[in-house]
Amino acid sequence: KSQPEFKLTLDQYLKRVVTPLRIKIANKKYQQNKIQIKEISKFYGVQPRFLIALWGIETDFGRLTGGFSVISSLATLAYDGRRHDYFKKELFNALKIIDDGHISLKKMTGSWAGAMGQCQFMPSSFLNYASDWDKNGTKDIWNTKSDVFASAANYLKKVGWSDKTTWGRKVYLGNYVIKNKKNKVLTLKEWSNEGILKMNKKKLPLILLKARLIIPDNYGNYGFLVYNNFDSLLNWNRSNYFAIAVGKLSDSIKEN
């Protein structure tokens, strides 16, 4: 119940989750699934590299999906956890998924908190966003990659994703004076006027794309200007570290 608090810095976290090996595998997985993932990407309007990156960060490309019985996990948390109302609802959602024939009780496995399959959907997310891309009558986020990619793409699209932009960029703070205006949204041109520069210390593109500034703890003279798609990633997982990791991994995937 009580887990020790051990806070990684962003750099420590990124070194663990965006490794050279994971970057290599991500590019390989993109090539292996390219035809299918491009179709899904076009249909939903979510760039393929983000679908591969999410898959990689969430479950190491479907390798680490959790071996817990989702029903047992949710039942335990519903009656023993701090957020019992939430987990009770998720338990009933999970039972509905079984009742609808998408997966058997025995095969419904996931994390200790009830997140399921290769995209780690909670049962409520499954009911809202899961997709039967191969049209076989079941939304199989456990074993069918096309359903996994389409479900992730559908989720991002429905929470506001746009394939016209990316996630954000690392920036040099330069002469920027940190003020107490949290979550201030400005255009790149306005951020440039505030003294923020590209990593090579050249001027930002003077365009009207809106961004907000994130400065992680102990991050020296650097930060991230993040765009609207970053908030879609936060909707998926409310961690700046997670969203930055997905963004960084996606940047290293060559779409061709």
Predicted regions and their residues:
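An acidic, Gly/Ser/Thr/Pro-rich helix-cap/linker signature
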Residues: K1-S41
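Acidic helix-start/capping segments at beta-turn-to-alpha-helix junctions
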Residues: K1-F6, W55-T59, S69-S72, K170-N175
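Short, functionally critical alpha-helical segments immediately adjacent to catalytic or ligand/cofactor-binding
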Residues: Q47-G62, A94-I97, A152-A153
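Flexible, glycine-rich surface segments
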Residues: G101-N218
